[in-house]
């Protein structure tokens, strides 16, 4: 018989309800209910996926071809880091470079010559040699020649003045001798006049009169005549008259002799005066030494100033030619205007000749820590409607790396007009991000990867509902 007590045991219920159906259906039901509840609260990111690349935020410099001549040196390398003024291209322009080198050499020589010419002018102004070292342009020799001319002029004038001095001394000596002779003759005339006065007026004659002997002789003759008259006894009137006549004749002859002697002396004095007058025109000293040296100095300075003017004109002409030649020469070489990363345009690589004005390369900013770059992608026009400035973009580098390289940026620009491609129209979208130091080894300009743009969020319930209802394409 059946024992009803068995219905009250747990073993019965365990055997009755512990089966496959109860063990599977209940968990699945609970899971389904939980999943449905999850769809109401959990959100799904709505994304737009595309292919993008890393681009610079700005172009530091654009480089164009400056010459159509054959290229003899080409340093254009894609992705190469270049320094400012690095040589990128060199065209066949050797003749122009040679001419520029010659012009620069001429300029250096002209400047060196100007320095030496300035030393010459200083030497002339200061009247001493200002050349510290040997002069290769002959200006020191010119100053030495100037000094030699000055010394020669000084010697000539000194010699001339010495001759004048000697001549003047000789003239003075002759004049003094003549004056002494005239004084002697005048004294003789005075002595004769003294005797003449003594004879005529009975005056006395000094004992130091050199002609006293003549006067004494005259008096002796007079005394003889008087003695002869006295010796005559009772001389008659005729005898007296004869004696008196002899005395008068003797006196007259003596006075006539004195007068003749005085006239002779006066004639000699007149002759000496004529000689003295002929000696009065003595030569004057040459006092033109200072003015002649000044004239010589002025001539030398004037010549050097003219040469300095010509030299400055030559330098100006050379500067103009050098400037023009540098303009020509700069077109025979292309240099990097600024430091950065070189991007060579694809059509340029390998070309031997490039037409003038053809763009050949661009220089991007150097990639370093904290450098900003653009994450650039092209979004089909069918997916662009949900994209806005300020949305996040995730860029994943498509390379075999131990760990995926992911960059996150913010959209800062969406083109207002689409770009046409074979596959259709697409809008250019740029997002800005900052490179960290750890990202630098794996980052290059032009590197491609997958871009994921988060344009919004939906609950999973709404997401699946839209899918079922055919609304939206996300």
Curated annotation (Swiss-Prot):
InterPro entries per UniProt: MesE/LcnD, MFP, Secretion_HlyD_CS
Membrane topology (Extracellular): 45-474
GO cellular component, one term: plasma membrane
Positions in the Cytoplasmic compartment: 1-21
One Pfam family, short name: HlyD_3
Transmembrane portions of the chain: 22-44
Summary of the function given for this chain in its UniProt record: Involved in the secretion of lactococcin A.
Designated name of the protein: Lactococcin A secretion protein LcnD
Recorded name of the encoding gene: lcnD
């Amino acid at each position: 018989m059946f024992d009803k007590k068995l219905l009250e045991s747990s073993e019965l219920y365990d055997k009755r309800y512990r089966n496959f159906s109860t063990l599977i259906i209940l968990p699945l039901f609970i899971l389904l209910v939980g999943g449905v509840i999850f769809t109401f609260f959990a959100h799904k990111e709505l994304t737009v996926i595309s292919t993008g690349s890393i681009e610079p935020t700005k172009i530091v410099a654009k480089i164009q071809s400056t010459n159509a001549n054959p290229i003899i040196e080409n340093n254009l390398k894609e992705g190469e880091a270049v320094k400012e003024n690095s040589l990128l291209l060199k065209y066949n322009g050797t003749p122009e470079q040679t001419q520029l080198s010659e012009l620069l050499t001429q300029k250096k020589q002209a400047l060196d010559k100007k320095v030496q010419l300035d030393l010459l002018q200083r030497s002339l102004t200061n009247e001493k040699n200002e050349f510290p070292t040997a002069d290769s342009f002959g200006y020191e020799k010119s100053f030495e020649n100037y000094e030699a001319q000055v010394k020669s002029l000084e010697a000539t004038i000194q010699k001339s003045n010495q001759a004048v001095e000697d001549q003047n001394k000789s003239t003075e000596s002759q004049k003094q001798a003549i004056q002494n002779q005239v004084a002697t003759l005048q004294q003789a005339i005075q002595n004769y006049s003294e005797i003449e006065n003594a004879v005529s007026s009975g005056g006395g004659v000094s004992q130091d009169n050199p002609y006293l002997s003549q006067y004494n002789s005259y008096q002796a003759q007079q005394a003889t005549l008087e003695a002869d008259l006295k010796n005559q006894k009772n001389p008659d009137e005729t005898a007296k008259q004869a004696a008196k006549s002899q005395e008068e004749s003797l006196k007259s002859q003596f006075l006539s002799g004195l007068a003749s002697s005085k006239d002779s002396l006066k004639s000699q004095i007149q002759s000496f005066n004529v000689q003295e007058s002929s000696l009065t025109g003595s030569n004057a000293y040459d006092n033109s030494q200072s003015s002649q040296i000044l004239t010589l100095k002025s001539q030398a300075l004037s010549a050097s100033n003219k040469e300095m003017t010509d030299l400055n004109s030559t330098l100006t002409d050379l500067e103009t030619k050098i400037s023009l030649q540098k303009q020509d020469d700069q077109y025979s070489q292309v240099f990097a205007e600024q430091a950065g990363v070189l991007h060579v345009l694809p059509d340029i690589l390998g070309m031997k000749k490039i037409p003038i004005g053809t763009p050949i390369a661009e220089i991007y900013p150097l990639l370093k820590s904290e450098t900003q770059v653009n994450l650039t992608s092209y979004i089909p026009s069918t997916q662009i409607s949900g994209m806005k400035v300020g949305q996040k973009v995730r860029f994943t580098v498509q390379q075999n790396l131990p760990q995926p390289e992911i960059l996150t940026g913010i959209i800062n620009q969406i083109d207002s007009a689409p770009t046409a491609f074979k596959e259709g129209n697409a809008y250019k979208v740029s997002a800005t991000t900052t490179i960290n130091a750890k990202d630098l080894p794996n980052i290059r300009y032009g590197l491609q990867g997958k871009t994921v743009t988060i344009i919004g969020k939906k609950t999973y319930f709404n997401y699946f509902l839209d899918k079922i209802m055919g609304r939206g394409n996300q």
